[in-house]
């Protein structure tokens, strides 16, 4: 320990900057996933802060976070989606079915897109679903347990906002039951979506297949991630309570309202009607 550790007196800005850089690397020098590196840096910075509070090292030795990056993060949190850009539920269903072509992997991309829309999952969560993640009854609604996400190229981790259980409608239940049967997915640990070479489906190929399908049915291009936004918009306009919508998406209610404010335009009229019914 004495040979390989710095003393508190050696913790100056230059050395801390080098430590901060190295905390973002694996032992072989390749970069860690951003979320993993951030988690490690938080622990390291807390340790240094304890030394600062005790007066053992000068204050503010840790590299300051980029203000530009911080501003970008604030802007992202305040950004709301344009709910008018999303196709109707019927148009979404038509576009999802149109994904299937003669192209390799098109059937996989169809089911993946259906999961993104009908369950409101992030693409990173879709690709990490396993057989054991599914509850698929012969009739009625089912459920997906969202416990993993592809947080980097191929490194699994927890979903962005933690594990959650998401109800799924019968149309998606039937689709997943047929998918599991067709592909003989019997192992509980088996990932639902893999290529013929048993690798992770390509995000770029998925996006291209989706854009071709949208174009073929006369719809404007939207991102795969926008399927999640379209799901939230559909749920809110159907009258799903804010808290339940937020839970299914893995959001706080505050984030939900700020992101999908355009889908809540009808709430004022509905609210007025309910108050009128009470006031007489």
Indicate residue ranges for each PLM-predicted region.
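C-terminal catalytic core of tyrosine-transesterase DNA break-rejoin enzymes
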Residues: 114, 118-125, 205, 209-214, ...
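Conserved tyrosine-mediated DNA breakage-rejoining catalytic core shared by Y-recombinases
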Residues: 64-72, 128-181, 254
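Short, polar N-cap/turn motifs at the start of nucleic acid-interacting alpha helices
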Residues: 133-141, 221, 240-261
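Short, charged phosphate-coordinating catalytic segments
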Residues: 49-61, 116-143, 243
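Basic/aromatic-enriched alpha-helical hairpins
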Residues: 1-31
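Basic, Lys/Arg- and aromatic-enriched nucleic-acid-binding interface segment
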Residues: 31-34, 38-42, 56-123, 127, ...
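Active-site/catalytic core of tyrosine-dependent DNA strand-transfer enzymes
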Residues: 88-93, 99-100, 148-152, 169-220
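Catalytic-site neighborhood detector that most strongly recognizes the C-terminal catalytic loop/helix
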Residues: 150, 249-274
